[in-house]
């Protein structure tokens, strides 16, 4: 398959599913190779909560996320430069993606005001007024030295409709141009555009049309997984992948539930991130192919099996459900063990998805995955059934 060299990224499409829009690709970046489809664990302040860089490496993680909003506040760009960027700071020699800080605007909306210039908000650390402009976002990300940087976009909640959505879409295009102009390191850092337009098909198409004219190395599908109905969600995903170029990576932001990952690979997405596996671990929830186990529950007090006997992660190799259940009463190590397992689960799921695409059996993989996850066809989520139907998979 032909490789496309764009900026600091070489993108190869290795295999495409003849039935669905799923594909297996390879990205070559400054810190090595990333095989897609891929799930990227999220470390808000340069660390995965409860997991070290070494442990991530040992799980075979090729790329993870850092958060510009938090790292730009503390410890700040000056310290980052002295530490040789985020890679040096967190002792991580593989690829890093940093977000622009835009998403935090929605979650901390009481702190922020959006104008054409940028986003104004009070620092949650010291209460100072800060203006995050597209230029400032790129300046911070250049200091962080991430392999993939995200443009600053004007983020509105996916449940909002009306003129604000259109305004945000047009502004995101203008801000993309400002981010491209501000990138002081295009031969080492890849700047991805973010497709906006809410749940409005026409606005999404307009945004796709404009942004795909820009010479950027990759595209993200933004403004989704913010509480909108799943039926709207998958339609916007497939609309986006229909209009995105084949020769560039497609990153669906904020998606991490196993079913969503599998369905969205079928719809043509390559990269995913979400805090879900690490956040849910803190509440004692371990991810398994048939759903999840609530390990705090007393039903596991005398259960001496591993979380999942087919999982090769350090937690499943060493500890029982009973042991982790007991730890929860006294020790934060329980969360640590489940976090390791949950990240391993996500990474392994995506490896299996990828293998099935390379071997030409992805549609069968999807059938088996759904059967294992839900058991009975009556329990399949209707949105997933409908979405898969549009790409040639009729669930049995």
From Swiss-Prot:
Location of the active site: 99, 273
One GO cellular component, as annotated: mitochondrial outer membrane
Gene3D superfamilies, A to Z: Queuine tRNA-ribosyltransferase-like (3.20.20.105)
Region entry RNA binding, spans: 254-260, 278-282
Keywords assigned by UniProt, alphabetized: Cytoplasm, Glycosyltransferase, Membrane, Metal-binding, Mitochondrion, Mitochondrion outer membrane, Transferase, tRNA processing, Zinc
GO terms under biological process: tRNA-guanine transglycosylation
Catalysed reactions listed for this entry: guanosine(34) in tRNA + queuine = queuosine(34) in tRNA + guanine
Topology in membrane: Peripheral membrane protein
Residue numbers binding queuine: 99-103, 153, 196, 223
Cross-referenced InterPro entries: TGT (IPR004803), TGT-like_sf (IPR036511), tRNA_ribo_trans-like (IPR002616)
Cofactor(s) the protein requires to work: Zn(2+)
Entries under Pfam families matching the protein: TGT
GO molecular function: metal ion binding; protein heterodimerization activity; protein homodimerization activity; tRNA-guanosine(34) queuine transglycosylase activity
Binding-site residues for Zn(2+), renumbered to this chain: 311, 313, 316, 341
EC number: 2.4.2.64
Compartment annotation: Cytoplasm; Mitochondrion outer membrane
Subunit structure: Heterodimer of a catalytic subunit qtrt1 and an accessory subunit qtrt2.
Family, as annotated: Belongs to the queuine tRNA-ribosyltransferase family.
Role, per record: Catalytic subunit of the queuine tRNA-ribosyltransferase (TGT) that catalyzes the base-exchange of a guanine (G) residue with queuine (Q) at position 34 (anticodon wobble position) in tRNAs with GU(N) anticodons (tRNA-Asp, -Asn, -His and -Tyr), resulting in the hypermodified nucleoside queuosine (7-(((4,5-cis-dihydroxy-2-cyclopenten-1-yl)amino)methyl)-7-deazaguanosine). Catalysis occurs through a double-displacement mechanism. The nucleophile active site attacks the C1' of nucleotide 34 to detach the guanine base from the RNA, forming a covalent enzyme-RNA intermediate.
NCBIfam families with a match to the protein in the record: Q_tRNA_tgt, tgt_general
Name assigned to this protein: Queuine tRNA-ribosyltransferase catalytic subunit 1
Source organism of the structure: Xenopus laevis
Gene transcribed to yield this protein: qtrt1
């Amino acid at each position: 398959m032909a490789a496309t060299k764009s900026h600091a990224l070489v993108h190869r499409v290795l295999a495409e599913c003849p039935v669905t829009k799923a594909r297996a690709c390879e990205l070559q970046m400054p810190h090595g190779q990333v095989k897609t489809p891929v799930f990227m664990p999220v470390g808000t302040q340069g660390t995965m909560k409860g997991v070290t860089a070494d442990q991530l490496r040992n799980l075979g993680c090729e790329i993870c996320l850092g958060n510009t909003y938090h790292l730009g506040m503390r410890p700040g760009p000056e310290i980052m430069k002295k530490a040789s960027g985020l890679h040096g700071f967190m002792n991580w020699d593989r690829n890093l993606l940093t977000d622009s800080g835009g998403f935090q605007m929605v979650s901390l909306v009481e702190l922020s005001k959006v104008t054409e210039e940028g986003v104004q908000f009070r620092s949650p650390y010291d209460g100072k007024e800060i203006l995050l402009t597209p230029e400032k976002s790129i300046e911070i990300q250049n200091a962080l030295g991430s392999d993939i940087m995200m443009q600053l976009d004007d983020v509105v909640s996916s449940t909002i409709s009306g003129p604000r959505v259109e305004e945000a879409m047009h502004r995101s295009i203008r801000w993309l141009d400002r981010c491209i102009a501000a990138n002081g390191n295009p031969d080492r850092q890849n700047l991805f555009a973010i497709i906006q337009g809410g749940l409005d098909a026409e606005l999404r198409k307009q945004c796709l049309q404009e942004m795909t004219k820009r010479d950027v190395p990759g595209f993200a599908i933004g403004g989704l997984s913010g509480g909108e109905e799943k039926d709207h969600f998958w339609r916007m995903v497939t609309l986006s992948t229909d209009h995105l170029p084949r020769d560039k990576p497609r990153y669906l932001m904020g998606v991490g539930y196993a079913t969503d990952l599998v369905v969205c690979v079928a719809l043509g997405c390559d990269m995913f991130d979400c805090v879900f596996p690490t956040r849910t671990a803190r509440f004692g929830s371990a991810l398994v192919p048939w759903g999840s186990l609530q390990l705090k529950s007393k039903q596991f007090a005398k259960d001496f099996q591993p979380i999942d006997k087919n999982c090769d992660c350090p937690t499943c190799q060493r500890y029982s459900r009973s042991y982790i259940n007991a730890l929860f009463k006294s020790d934060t190590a329980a969360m640590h063990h489940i976090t390791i397992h949950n990240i391993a689960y996500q990474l392994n799921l995506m490896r299996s998805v990828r293998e099935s695409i390379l071997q030409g059996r992805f549609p069968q993989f999807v059938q088996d995955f759904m059967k294992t996850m839900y058991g009975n066809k009556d329990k399949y989520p209707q949105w997933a059934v409908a979405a898969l139907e549009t790409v040639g998979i009729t669930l049995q």
